[in-house]
C-alpha cells in the first residue's frame, strides 16, 4: 500500500469484547461460582423472588464413597429445574440431604480394622467411626456437587444422623405405633447370612446367571378326602404328591403342599415305577413332566384342586404329617408340577397359606444360614452349601427324589455383600401396610407421575407388597425405641416411652440409646421398674430413615417435586409415601419425576472391569492425559444432561462428550459474536422501535419468539432435550448460518450510528439477553459469563436476577414468517450453485458472484423484484436479495436460460445462474460494484461505502 492509498481499516466497525473464545472452564467456572457465593445470588432470590414457594425435596444419596455419573445426572436435573423456577420468579427451597446410616458404612469401617480391633469393637466405637466416615464422605460429595454448579442450602443440608432428624424419625415411628401400624411378629423375611440381618426389598438385587439345584420329589399320600373317584382310593399305598422346588434346603421345614383350587389335577400311573406307582400332578403338565422325569405318565383320573383339600401326606424325612391346602394364584402350570411345597417359615406365600390354616411357623435355620437342632440330622450344616446337598441325598436315599437338575433363574442377593439371601422367619418389627394400603393407593392417584407409566409401576408394587420389615440387627442406625420385659419378652412401647426417648435423642442424638442406662431412658413414671426391662438392640431399616425425610425437612408441607432414578419406585418414593400416608393420610409429593440409568456409548452397564466408566470429576477437570481426556468443565457435563431423554437409560462416553463440547463451543461463539457487535450499543438510546425495523429484523424477532416459547415449553414439561435441540438449532441454523451471516455487512461497513446497523444491533441485544436467560438453567456458568461481559448497563448484577426470557406478542407475524421461510429456502438453492462455482474456483468468496434468477410464479417474481432495487442506495439496505444471498449483484430474469452463465440450477418453476460479479472490488466492503473508481475522493470505494463514510448508509 502506497502513502497515497488511504487505509479504511479504522472506518470499519469490527467486533470488540473481552469475552474469551475459549471457556477456560477449569479457572473461569470456579470464579463465577465464587461470584454467586459472594453476592449470595441464590439466597437472595430464594427470599426476594415475588412468586410462590417451589420445593424440590432432595432424595438423599448414600454417604459412602465418591460420586459417580448417575449422581451427576440426578443432581444436575434437579438443579436445572430449580434454576428455571428461580428465573420464573419462584422462591425455590432446595435443601440437599444425605443418607448416613446403614450397613454399607458399617462395612467400610470394618474393612479398615485389623482382626484384633474388630474383636474389641463396641457398638459405640463402631458408631463413632461410622459417623466420622459418613461426615467425611458428605464433605467430599458436597464439594463435588457444588463444582457441578448445583445451588442449594449447602450451609444447612439435612443428614439422617443429626439429632433433629433422628428425633423427627422417631416421631414418625411413634405415630405409626399409636395408630396400630407397627407390630412384632415371627415372619419370613429376606435374610442375608453374609450380613446377618434382615433386608428390605430395596436392598436386594437379582443378578443374571444364578443356578440353583432344583428337584422334583414325591411325598407319600396317606389319606384322601371323600368325594373323589374310586381310582384315587385304589392308588393309596403307592401314591405320591409330586412337588418341585429350587430350594431343597427348605424341605425339612415343609408343613403343607398348596394347590390352585381352579386347576385340574391328574392321578397318573407311572411307568416304570419305583417307590410310587401313582403321582398327583397338574393335568396340563403331564406331557412335559413325562419328558422331564423320563417316565410314561398315564392319566387315570382327574379332580379339581379344591377337591384335594385336606388330603394328608407323610413328610419324607421327619416323623410328621402335612396336608394338601388351597394356595393362591401363585400356584400355576408355568413350571414344576402344579403343586407347591409349602414352608411357612421360608416364604411369604407359604406364610400366607400358613396364617389362613393356622400352621406353625417352622424355620430351623440360624442367623448364619445354618440348620438348627430342629432340623435333626442336618443341624449345623449351611443351607446354601452342604446343607442343601445333604437334604437332596436324604431324599434320594428314602426314595422320594424323582429328579434333580440345575435351574438358572433370578435369585435375590444382598446388594452390599453380593451374596445370596434366604427367606427365614425371625422376630422382627413390621409396618402393617395392610392397615393403610388403600389410602396409599388413593394418594398415588393424586400425584403427577413423569413419565406417566411410573404411576402403574408404583401402584402395582404397593398393591402387591407385603408388610414392611423395618428392623435391622445392626448398630449403625436409629434405634427402635423398645424395651423388653426380661422374663416374658413382652415389648414395652407406649406414647410415653417413645416421647421420652425422642426428647433424649433430640437433645443428645441416637448414641444416647447405647450410652444411657434403661433407667435413664425410661420416663419418670416407669423408672422404678427399670430392673424389669432391657433395651432392644435393633435399629431401623435405612429406608425408614430416608423415608422419614419429609417429617424432618418438609414438616406439614408437600413437596412440589421428588426426582430420582426409576429404581426408587420400590425404594425412596415408596418408603416416603408409606410413612407419610400412615401419619398424615397424604403423599409427601405433588409430582414425581424419574430418570433412567447411565450406560456407556454401546449401551452397556458401566464397570471397572470393562474400563467404560465415565467419572464426572474427569469430565470436569480432565483425565491424566489431558489431550485424550480434556477438562470440559461443568457446563459441558450439564449440557449432556439436557441432551438426553432421561426417561430411558442414557448413554455417555468420549465421543458423546466431544460432540457436546462442539455444541457448547457453537453456543459460546454465537454469544461472543453478539457481544462483540454490541460494544457501542446502549439499548436505552439506540434501540430502534419495532415498527421501524426492516422486515428481516422483524422476521428474526418472530423466530426468537418461536424459539424461546419452545424453550419455555420444554422446561415447563421437563423435556430438556427439546431445549437442547432448540438452542442448538437457534445458534447454528437461525443465527450463525443465516441472520449473523447476512448481518456482518450491516454491522461492519454501515455508518456506526446509522439505522441500518442500529436495527440489527437491536435484534442482537434482544437475542443475546434472552439467550443468556434461556441457557442459564442448563449452562449457568456460560450464561453468567455472558451477562458479566454485557457492554451495556442492566439493572441486574447477575443473569439470574434478570428473570426469564422477555418476549413481546407483537413480534409474532405468521405471514411475514411464511414469506421469509420461502426466502430462506430460495437462499439454500442459490447456495448450492455458489458452492459449485466455489469448488471449481470461479469464485472464492460469494461476494465475487452475481446471481441470475428466474421464478415462474408471477406474484413471487413481483415480490422478489421489490427486494432487488436498481442500485445500492435506493433500497433499505437490508431486505434485498443481494444481502440475502451474500453476493454483489442479483438480476431477475423474464424467462429461464435468458443468459449464458457457467453455473446453473434448474428446478420446477425455478432457474438459478451464477457467474462472476461485474465491476471492481471495493477495498472496504469487498463487494463488487461498477461504482468503484467513480469517486475522485475515494476511487477504491463503492457508492455504499462512500455513503457510509458520510454517515448516510
Curated annotation (Swiss-Prot):
Cofactor binding note of this UniProt entry: Binds 1 zinc ion per subunit.
One GO term (biological process): isoleucyl-tRNA aminoacylation
Catalytic activity, EC: 6.1.1.5
Keywords carried by this UniProt record: Aminoacyl-tRNA synthetase, ATP-binding, Cytoplasm, Ligase, Metal-binding, Nucleotide-binding, Protein biosynthesis, Zinc
SUPFAM superfamilies documented for this protein: Anticodon-binding domain of a subclass of class I aminoacyl-tRNA synthetases (SSF47323), Nucleotidylyl transferase (SSF52374), ValRS/IleRS/LeuRS editing domain (SSF50677)
GO cellular component: cytoplasm
Primary enzyme class: ligase
Cofactor(s), names only, from the UniProt record: Zn(2+)
UniProt main location, coarse: cytoplasm
Motif ('HIGH' region): 61-71
Reaction equation(s) it catalyzes: tRNA(Ile) + L-isoleucine + ATP = L-isoleucyl-tRNA(Ile) + AMP + diphosphate
Lineage top rank: taxon: Bacteria
Entry's localization field: Cytoplasm
GO molecular function: aminoacyl-tRNA deacylase activity; ATP binding; isoleucine-tRNA ligase activity; tRNA binding; zinc ion binding
Residues annotated to bind Zn(2+): 922, 925, 942, 945
Binding site for ATP: 608
Pfam family, one: zf-FPG_IleRS
UniProt short sequence motif 'KMSKS' region, positions renumbered to this chain: 605-609
Binding site for L-isoleucyl-5'-AMP: 564
Role summary: Catalyzes the attachment of isoleucine to tRNA(Ile). As IleRS can inadvertently accommodate and process structurally similar amino acids such as valine, to avoid such errors it has two additional distinct tRNA(Ile)-dependent editing activities. One activity is designated as 'pretransfer' editing and involves the hydrolysis of activated Val-AMP. The other activity is designated 'posttransfer' editing and involves deacylation of mischarged Val-tRNA(Ile).
Assigned protein family: Belongs to the class-I aminoacyl-tRNA synthetase family. IleS type 1 subfamily.
Domain notes: IleRS has two distinct active sites: one for aminoacylation and one for editing. The misactivated valine is translocated from the active site to the editing site, which sterically excludes the correctly activated isoleucine. The single editing site contains two valyl binding pockets, one specific for each substrate (Val-AMP or Val-tRNA(Ile)).
Subunit comment: Monomer.
Name of protein: Isoleucine--tRNA ligase
Gene: ileS
Amino acid at each position: 500500500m502506497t502513502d497515497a492509498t488511504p487505509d479504511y481499516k479504522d472506518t470499519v466497525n469490527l467486533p470488540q469484547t473481552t469475552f474469551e473464545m475459549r471457556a477456560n472452564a477449569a479457572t473461569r467456572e470456579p470464579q463465577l461460582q465464587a461470584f454467586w457465593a459472594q453476592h449470595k445470588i441464590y439466597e437472595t432470590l430464594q427470599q426476594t423472588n415475588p412468586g410462590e414457594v417451589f420445593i424440590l425435596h432432595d432424595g438423599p444419596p448414600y454417604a459412602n464413597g465418591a460420586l459417580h455419573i448417575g449422581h451427576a445426572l440426578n443432581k444436575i436435573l434437579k438443579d436445572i429445574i430449580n434454576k428455571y423456577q428461580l428465573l420464573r420468579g419462584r422462591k425455590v427451597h432446595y435443601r440437599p440431604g444425605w443418607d448416613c446410616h446403614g450397613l454399607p458404612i458399617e462395612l467400610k469401617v470394618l474393612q479398615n480394622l485389623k482382626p484384633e480391633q474388630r474383636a474389641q469393637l463396641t457398638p459405640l466405637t463402631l458408631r463413632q467411626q461410622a459417623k466420622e466416615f459418613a461426615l467425611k464422605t458428605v464433605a467430599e460429595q458436597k464439594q463435588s456437587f457444588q463444582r457441578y454448579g448445583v445451588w442449594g442450602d449447602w450451609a444447612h443440608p439435612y443428614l439422617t444422623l443429626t439429632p433433629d432428624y433422628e428425633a423427627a424419625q422417631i416421631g414418625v415411628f411413634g405415630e405409626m405405633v399409636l395408630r396400630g401400624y407397627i407390630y412384632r411378629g415371627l415372619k419370613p423375611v429376606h435374610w442375608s447370612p453374609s450380613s446377618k440381618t434382615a433386608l428390605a426389598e430395596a436392598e436386594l438385587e437379582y443378578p443374571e446367571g444364578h443356578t440353583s439345584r432344583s428337584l422334583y420329589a414325591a411325598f407319600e399320600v396317606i389319606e384322601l378326602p371323600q368325594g373323589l373317584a374310586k381310582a384315587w382310593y385304589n392308588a393309596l399305598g403307592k401314591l405320591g404328591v409330586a412337588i418341585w422346588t429350587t430350594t431343597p434346603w427348605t424341605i425339612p421345614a415343609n408343613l403343607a403342599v398348596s394347590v390352585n383350587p381352579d386347576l385340574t389335577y391328574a392321578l397318573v400311573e407311572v411307568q416304570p415305577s419305583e417307590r410310587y406307582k401313582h403321582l398327583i400332578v397338574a393335568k396340563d403338565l403331564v406331557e412335559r413332566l413325562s419328558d422331564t422325569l423320563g417316565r410314561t405318565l398315564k392319566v387315570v383320573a382327574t379332580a379339581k384342586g379344591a377337591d384335594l383339600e385336606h388330603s394328608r401326606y407323610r413328610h419324607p424325612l421327619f416323623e410328621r404329617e402335612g396336608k394338601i391346602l388351597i394356595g393362591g394364584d401363585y400356584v400355576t402350570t408355568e413350571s414344576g408340577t402344579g403343586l407347591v411345597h409349602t414352608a411357612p417359615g421360608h416364604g411369604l406365600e407359604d406364610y400366607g397359606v400358613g396364617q389362613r390354616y393356622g400352621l406353625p411357623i417352622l424355620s430351623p435355620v440360624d442367623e448364619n444360614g445354618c440348620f438348627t437342632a430342629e432340623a435333626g440330622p442336618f443341624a449345623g450344616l449351611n443351607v446354601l452349601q452342604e446343607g442343601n446337598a445333604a437334604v437332596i441325598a436324604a431324599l434320594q436315599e428314602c426314595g422320594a427324589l424323582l429328579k434333580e437338575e440345575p435351574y438358572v433363574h433370578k435369585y435375590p442377593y444382598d446388594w452390599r455383600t453380593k451374596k445370596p439371601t434366604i427367606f427365614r422367619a425371625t422376630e422382627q418389627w413390621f409396618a402393617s401396610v395392610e392397615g393403610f394400603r388403600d389410602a396409599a393407593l388413593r394418594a398415588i392417584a393424586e400425584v403427577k407421575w413423569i413419565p406417566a407409566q411410573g404411576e402403574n409401576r408404583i401402584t402395582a408394587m404397593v398393591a402387591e407388597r407385603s408388610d414392611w420389615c423395618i428392623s435391622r440387627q445392626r448398630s449403625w442406625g436409629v434405634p427402635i425405641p423398645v424395651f423388653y420385659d426380661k422374663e416374658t419378652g413382652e415389648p414395652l412401647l407406649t406414647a410415653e416411652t417413645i416421647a421420652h426417648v425422642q426428647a433424649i435423642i433430640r437433645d443428645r442424638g441416637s448414641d444416647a440409646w447405647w450410652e444411657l442406662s434403661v433407667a435413664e431412658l425410661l420416663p419418670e413414671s416407669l423408672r422404678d421398674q427399670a430392673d424389669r426391662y432391657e433395651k432392644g438392640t435393633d435399629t431401623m431399616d435405612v429406608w425408614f430413615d430416608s423415608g422419614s425425610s419429609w417429617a424432618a425437612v418438609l414438616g406439614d408441607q408437600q413437596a412440589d417435586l421428588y426426582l430420582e432414578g426409576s429404581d426408587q419406585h420400590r425404594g425412596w418414593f415408596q418408603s416416603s409415601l408409606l410413612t407419610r400416608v400412615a401419619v398424615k393420610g397424604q403423599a409427601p409429593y405433588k409430582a414425581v419425576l424419574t430418570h433412567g440409568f447411565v450406560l456407556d456409548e454401546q449401551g452397556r452397564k458401566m464397570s471397572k472391569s470393562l474400563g467404560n466408566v465415565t467419572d464426572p470429576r474427569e469430565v470436569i477437570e480432565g483425565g491424566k492425559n489431558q489431550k485424550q481426556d480434556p477438562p470440559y468443565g461443568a457446563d459441558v457435563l450439564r449440557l449432556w444432561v439436557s441432551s438426553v431423554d432421561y426417561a430411558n437409560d442414557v448413554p455417555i462416553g468420549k465421543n458423546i462428550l466431544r460432540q457436546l463440547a462442539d455444541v457448547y463451543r457453537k453456543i459460546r461463539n454465537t454469544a461472543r459474536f453478539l457481544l462483540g457487535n454490541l460494544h457501542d450499543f446502549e439499548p436505552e438510546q439506540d434501540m430502534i422501535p419495532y415498527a421501524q425495523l426492516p422486515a428481516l429484523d422483524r422476521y428474526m424477532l418472530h423466530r426468537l419468539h418461536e424459539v424461546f416459547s419452545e424453550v419455555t415449553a420444554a422446561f415447563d414439561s421437563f423435556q430438556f432435550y427439546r431445549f437442547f435441540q432448540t438452542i442448538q438449532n437457534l445458534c447454528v441454523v437461525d443465527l450463525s448460518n443465516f441472520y449473523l451471516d447476512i448481518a456482518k455487512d450491516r454491522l461492519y461497513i454501515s455508518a456506526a450510528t446509522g439505522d441500518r446497523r442500529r436495527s440489527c444491533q437491536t435484534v442482537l441485544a434482544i437475542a443475546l439477553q434472552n439467550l443468556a436467560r434461556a441457557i442459564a438453567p442448563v449452562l449457568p456458568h456460560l450464561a453468567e459469563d455472558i451477562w458479566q461481559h454485557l457492554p451495556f448497563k442492566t439493572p441486574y448484577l447477575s443473569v439470574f436476577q434478570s428473570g426469564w426470557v422477555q418476549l413481546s406478542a407483537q413480534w409474532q407475524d405468521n405471514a411475514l414468517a411464511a414469506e421469509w421461510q420461502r426466502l430462506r429456502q430460495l437462499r439454500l438453492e442459490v447456495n448450492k450453485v455458489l458452492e459449485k462455482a466455489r469448488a471449481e474456483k470461479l469464485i472464492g468468496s460469494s461476494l465475487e458472484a452475481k446471481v441470475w434468477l428466474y421464478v415462474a410464479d408471477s406474484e413471487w417474481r413481483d415480490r422478489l423484484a421489490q427486494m432487488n432495487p436498481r442500485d445500492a442506495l435506493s433500497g433499505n439496505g437490508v431486505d434485498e436479495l443481494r444481502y440475502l444471498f451474500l453476493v454483489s449483484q442479483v438480476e431477475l430474469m423474464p424467462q429461464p436460460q435468458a443468459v449464458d452463465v457457467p453455473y446453473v440450477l434448474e428446478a420446477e418453476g425455478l432457474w438459478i445462474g451464477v457467474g462472476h460479479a461485474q465491476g471492481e472490488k471495493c477495498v472496504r466492503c469487498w463487494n463488487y460494484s461498477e461504482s468503484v473508481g467513480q469517486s475522485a475522493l475515494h476511487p477504491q470505494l463503492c457508492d455504499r461505502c462512500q455513503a457510509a463514510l458520510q454517515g448516510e448508509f
